[in-house]
Amino acid sequence: MSKKHPVIAITGSSGAGTSTVKSAFNHIFINVGANPVIIEGDSYHRYNRDEMKRVMEKKERIGNKHFSHFGPEANLFGELEKAFKDYGEKGRCKKRLYLHSDKEARPFGQKAGEFTPWEDVGKDTNLLFYEGLHGGVVDGDIDVAKYVDLLIGVVPVVNLEWIQKIHRDKELRGYSAEATVDTIHRRMWDYINYITPQFSRTHINFQRVPTVDTSNPFIARDIPTLDESFVVVRFRDHKYCDFVYLQDMVHDSFLSRPNTLVVPGGKMGFIMELILREEIEKMLNH
């Protein structure tokens, strides 16, 4: 961990409230004068889009049906750990971008699904901000979580996560529900072993819980809205919260356990800003 060059990581699946999280952190960074290095988790995938497809087909031919972007074989965990460690020690690290679309790729003269070259970043920045699947991952001797000063989990309950995944893949990628269910099956081993353990290492978790029936996520017509949800906020340490203040600020919030605050789903971005702004200010002013 670093007091001079803090590292903040958001860990959670794509679509688990990403737009709300990004909006909240944009507001915080502007308000506290932060100038972050921003690292996206998919830039630390091991393979580009075409390579991943070929490797996955090869793995399936030899009987490995669990190869996925959730696990170590398809990611550069060691390089991610080094980036966090280097930034914490020196305020510098290496970074690249994953180009999701033709629009993103065009300015670089590359194709969608490729990576930009690695570059040295960090000059004139005062924190590193990571958002992706593996901000708190541990795998053997690799311990990414060890170098994170503030680790935040953003994760819906699993049925809601699957509903979001099915709808997102259909709308953005044109995948059938059956194809997405196959992806969920393939990722499950890595999900259990590499994704979920991270949420026990976080300092704060934000978990969205729907108040409508999601018991069969594979036939759900709609994604439950924020207003059809609560957000469960779990704190590992009471130093990150003033429960009396937070309950005064958020109408209809309540404590479900001594370290757990529940707020209406529509207040997810607001509660993030209330809780995290003060912590980030402390880091920058230390």
Predicted regions and their residues:
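Pre-Walker A (Motif I) flank of P-loop NTPase domains
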Residues: 2-8, 125
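P-loop (Walker A) phosphate-binding loop of NTP-binding proteins
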Residues: 13
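Conserved lysine of the Walker
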Residues: 18
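Post-Walker A alpha-helix
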Residues: 21-22, 26
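Conserved nucleotide-sensing/catalytic segment adjacent to the nucleotide-binding pocket
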Residues: 32-40, 44-104
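Glycine-rich phosphate-binding loop used to anchor ATP phosphates in small-molecule kinases
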Residues: 72-144, 186-199, 209, 213, ...
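C-terminal accessory "lid"/substrate-recognition subdomains
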Residues: 114-123, 144-146, 158-286
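Short, well-ordered beta-strand core segments
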Residues: 128, 151-152, 205-206
